[in-house]
């Protein structure tokens, strides 16, 4: 059987594999450690800085989540961290916040508290107030 060049990419040009059989970790496919210790550290940090969840009402969750994301900056919060901090249905809370805030969802692979690899876990980063709303507010003389 004829073999085309580069059909077997086990040499240069293919994905490098580590000893465990998975792809070698680079900056683009880094796996985030989301162990119990790391999640506890995030929750403790939020509490120390006054942005921990105070109660479970939806309105409080939205306002506190916005403050927590604002405090965390580019580090944001992923789904596991947010759930451990007390936010129920993290994606729903983020969707509600997106009505007035610009929030970016990044996807990352994590080793969860269960010790298993979870691919494509969302990490939410607050970018600021939505610019399209600012323009609409200014266009109506502040009445919106």
Q: What residue ranges belong to the model's regions?
A:
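DNA-binding patch around the recognition helix
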Residues: 14, 19-59, 94-141
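Eukaryotic low-complexity, non-globular regulatory regions
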Residues: 8-10
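Short, well-structured alpha-helical interface segments that form or flank functional binding sites
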Residues: 60, 77, 89-92
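Short amphipathic alpha-helical interaction segments
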Residues: 84-96
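Short acidic, hydrophobic short linear motifs in intrinsically disordered regions
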Residues: 73-83
């Amino acid at each position: 059987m004829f073999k085309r060049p580069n059909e077997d990419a086990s040499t240069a040009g293919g994905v490098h594999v580590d000893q465990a059989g998975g792809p070698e970790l680079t900056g683009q496919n880094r796996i985030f450690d989301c162990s119990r210790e790391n999640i506890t550290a995030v929750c403790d940090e939020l509490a120390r800085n006054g942005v921990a969840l105070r109660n479970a009402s939806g309105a409080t969750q939205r306002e506190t989540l916005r403050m927590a994301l604002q405090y965390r900056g580019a580090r944001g919060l992923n789904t596991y961290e947010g759930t451990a901090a007390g936010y129920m249905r993290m994606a729903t809370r983020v969707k509600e916040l997106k009505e007035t805030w610009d929030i970016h969802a990044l996807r990352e692979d994590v080793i969860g508290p269960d010790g298993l690899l979870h691919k494509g876990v969302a990490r939410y980063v607050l970018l600021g107030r939505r610019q399209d709303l600012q323009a609409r507010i200014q266009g109506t003389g502040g009445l919106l």
